[in-house]
Amino acid sequence: MKKTNDNYHSARFVMSAPNIHHLPPDQGMEVAFAGRSNAGKSSALNTLTQQKNLAKISKTPGRTQLINLFEVAEGIRLVDLPGYGYAAVPLAIKIKWQKALNEYLNKRDCLRGLVILMDIRHPLKNLDQQMIVWAINKRIPVYLLLTKVDKLSRSASKIQLDMVKEAILPFMGDIEVDVFSSLKKIGIDKLQNKLNAWFSGSVNE
């Protein structure tokens, strides 16, 4: 397989789907991006692909209501999952999102890894930890990105990073954590390397 780090900038939007029943066939490889509303998922995807408008960014938390697919190369996709944890979303919609999220995570066999984005100032909220536990139980590798690191000083960022590293030890799974900033392009190379490693496996036919 061609190195995908040469292809991220060529990523293209494929579709938005309300649930897995509207997604393409469960083939190839996908890496999903998850996180609380306003954790910076869309910004991270745009930075990764060097396309500022690939994933729509909104200042309104909870705007990502659908499963959004982006194709990097044939059979290789990035998935932007609905943001979770925004209290102002009506309960009926919240339940609908939760069902779509659960179905994708539990039934999508081509999922190769899960990137969970968390604001470095507010990491490891209950829903974040639930996502980690789910992934570990399913033996899905997890990459935690502490976003918006540019909002903190270097020393404060290190304190937060060390705290999260310590906190995830009890999870005992394939889980790593790094800092990230879409604004300052911090952590982009490490993210690319992680995705390349996940995508280097054999394609699920």
UniProtKB/Swiss-Prot annotation:
This is Probable GTP-binding protein EngB. Residues 27-201 form the EngB-type G domain. CDD domains: YihA_EngB (cd01876). GO terms for biological process: division septum assembly. Belongs to the TRAFAC class TrmE-Era-EngA-EngB-Septin-like GTPase superfamily. EngB GTPase family. InterPro entries: G_ENGB_dom, GTP-bd, GTP-bd_ribosome_bio_YsxC, P-loop_NTPase. Keywords: Cell cycle, Cell division, GTP-binding, Magnesium, Metal-binding, Nucleotide-binding, Septation. Pfam families: MMR_HSR1 (PF01926). Mg(2+) binds at residues 42, 64. SUPFAM superfamilies: P-loop containing nucleoside triphosphate hydrolases. The keyword Cell division applies.
